[in-house]
């Protein structure tokens, strides 16, 4: 699915390349993602780091807003490095009493579950785990595979994207803490690789290929998430990792030493489905390697050199034997034979444009948010 109508080119600053068909380069060969980071994101991020009192003031504001409530905020927890460290920052550095929220989609590896348990126990936090109905998750994931789109992790992602704010409002928590931060997450995969959580498209794909109603599956549209919840329910999203020095490798060592936290191979590989989707399905079927985005973010953050990233990209995303085992496991768990699953993988590639979608509305909203200075990251 790479653009064969233009010569191959890789950014001279990061490792993004023309596998993103919309990428552009300046006269020095630097991509538009890098230029956007240096012009729009880095200045505001550095301003936050120059304000040592910002974290304390933010904590005081959250405590004031949550006065009289059992919890000061709610934190989405995956067991990964960002959300694990966020729990530490919230409890120990900000003095907050957060409720930890996790989602069991049926695919988490033991390392993720154990990491969550270690952090929650060590910090003496309360946790709520939402268990997604497996039959509904399975049906939606099968529908997505049959749709032939690249975004096979959308059913899982959406259950988390929707579940967290839905539960926050239901439980009366106005402050949602996120592990996202502007620095190492400014280059997100282009929409042809990983489309946004478009509820209209999710429903259309499920209508065409699903076999059972989604009665309990967590759902949340962009208008509800971006407008209704913040304006009418007072929900606020806060990103404390923007307010502290955040070197991911140092944070990993800190978590290991203090909590017995265990690392995993790559970003998001704490989940067997995501590991297979990002490490096998996307590269083999579409030619997309999300590590290019992850490594480019680390390059911009100063925690990885371009040479190190290029060397990593020469290696497979993870062990090829494990890929085949994951492939067989996922097919069996979804009720597919090996031949049926391979037929899906070999099928005609499609995108969100082949289904009903809200891309025009999402684009318009992004333009407005960027104009207002609310959104600084580059989307396409």
Briefly describe each language-model feature range:
Residues 85-86:
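Hydrophobic positions on the alpha1 helix immediately C-terminal to the Walker A/P-loop
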């Amino acid at each position: 699915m790479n653009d064969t109508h233009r010569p191959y080119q890789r950014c001279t600053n990061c490792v993004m390349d023309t596998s993103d068909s919309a990428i552009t380069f300046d006269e020095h060969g630097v991509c538009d993602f890098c230029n956007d980071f240096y012009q729009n994101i880095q200045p505001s991020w550095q301003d936050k780091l120059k304000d040592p009192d910002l974290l304390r003031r933010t904590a005081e504001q959250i405590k004031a807003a949550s006065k009289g409530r059992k919890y000061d905020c709610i934190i989405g927890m995956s067991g990964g490095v960002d959300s694990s460290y966020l729990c530490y920052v919230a409890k120990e550095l900000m003095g907050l009493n957060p409720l930890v929220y996790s989602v069991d989609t049926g695919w988490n590896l033991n390392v993720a579950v154990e990491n969550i348990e270690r952090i929650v126990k060590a910090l003496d936090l309360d946790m709520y785990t939402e268990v997604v109905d497996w039959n509904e998750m399975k049906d939606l994931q099968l529908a997505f595979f049959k749709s032939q789109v690249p975004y096979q992790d959308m059913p899982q992602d959406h259950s988390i994207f929707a579940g967290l704010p839905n539960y926050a409002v239901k439980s009366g928590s106005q402050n949602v803490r996120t592990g996202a931060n502007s620095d190492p997450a400014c280059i997100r995969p282009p929409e042809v690789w990983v489309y946004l959580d478009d509820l209209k498209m999710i429903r259309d794909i499920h209508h065409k290929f699903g076999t059972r109603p989604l009665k309990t599956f967590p759902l949340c549209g962009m208008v509800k998430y971006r407008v209704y919840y913040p304006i009418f329910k007072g929900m606020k999203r806060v990103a404390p990792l923007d307010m502290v020095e955040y070197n991911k490798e140092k944070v990993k060592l800190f978590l290991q030493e203090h909590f017995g936290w265990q690392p995993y191979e790559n970003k998001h590989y704490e989940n067997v489905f995501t590991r297979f989707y990002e490490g096998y399905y996307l590269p083999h079927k579409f030619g997309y390697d999300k590590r290019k985005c992850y490594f480019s973010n680390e390059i911009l953050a100063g925690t990885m050199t371009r040479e190190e990233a290029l060397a990593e990209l020469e290696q497979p995303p993870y062990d090829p034997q494990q890929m085949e085992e994951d492939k067989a496991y996922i097919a069996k768990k979804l009720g597919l034979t090996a031949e049926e699953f391979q037929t899906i993988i070999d099928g005609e590639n499609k995108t969100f444009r082949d289904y009903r979608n809200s891309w025009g509305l999402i684009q318009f909203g992004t333009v407005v948010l960027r104009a207002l200075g609310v959104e600084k990251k580059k989307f396409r």
